[in-house]
């Protein structure tokens, strides 16, 4: 009673097709689809970049610690030999 029925929606759709034409509506649909696809791709790239950044931050910290330990061991060995 207060809602829009299927027939009213069908009439609105026919009027829109008559006003804009199928070519223009197809172009708008493809533009909208490519925009959504680009948005999803950007979101997934951003998440993978965050994951890669976490991994990259983890590895250098370990390397720095190992390098510092190696330098300290070399200094101790030099002192013992002298």
UniProtKB/Swiss-Prot annotation:
Known role: Part of the twin-arginine translocation (Tat) system that transports large folded proteins containing a characteristic twin-arginine motif in their signal peptide across membranes. TatA could form the protein-conducting channel of the Tat system.
PANTHER family, alphabetically?
SEC-INDEPENDENT PROTEIN TRANSLOCASE PROTEIN TATA
Q: Which family does it belong to?
A: Belongs to the TatA/E family.
Quaternary data: The Tat system comprises two distinct complexes: a TatABC complex, containing multiple copies of TatA, TatB and TatC subunits, and a separate TatA complex, containing only TatA subunits. Substrates initially bind to the TatABC complex, which probably triggers association of the separate TatA complex to form the active translocon.
NCBIfam families per UniProt? PRK02958.1, PRK04598.1, tatAE
Gene it is expressed from: tatA
Compartments where found: Cell inner membrane
Q: Which GO terms describe its biological process?
A: protein transport by the Tat complex
Supply the name of the protein: Sec-independent protein translocase protein TatA
Origin superkingdom: Bacteria
A GO cellular component annotation here is: TAT protein transport complex
Q: Write the record's keywords in alphabetical order, separated by commas.
A: Cell inner membrane, Cell membrane, Membrane, Protein transport, Translocation, Transmembrane, Transmembrane helix, Transport
Q: Is Transmembrane helix a UniProt keyword of this protein?
A: yes
Please name the Pfam families in this protein's record: TatA_B_E
Q: Which organism is it from?
A: Aliivibrio salmonicida (strain LFI1238)
Tell me the membrane topology, using the record's own terms. Answer: Single-pass membrane protein
Ranges that cross the membrane: 1-21
Which residues does the annotated region (Disordered) include? 48-82
| GO MF term set | protein transmembrane transporter activity
């Amino acid at each position: 009673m207060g809602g829009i029925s299927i027939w009213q929606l069908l009439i609105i759709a026919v009027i829109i097709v008559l006003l804009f034409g199928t070519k223009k509506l197809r172009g708008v649909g493809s533009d909208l689809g490519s925009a959504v696809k680009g948005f999803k791709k950007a979101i997934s790239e951003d998440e993978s970049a965050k994951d890669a950044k976490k991994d990259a931050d983890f590895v250098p910290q370990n390397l720095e610690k190992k390098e510092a330990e190696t330098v300290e061991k070399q200094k101790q060995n030099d002192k013992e030999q002298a």
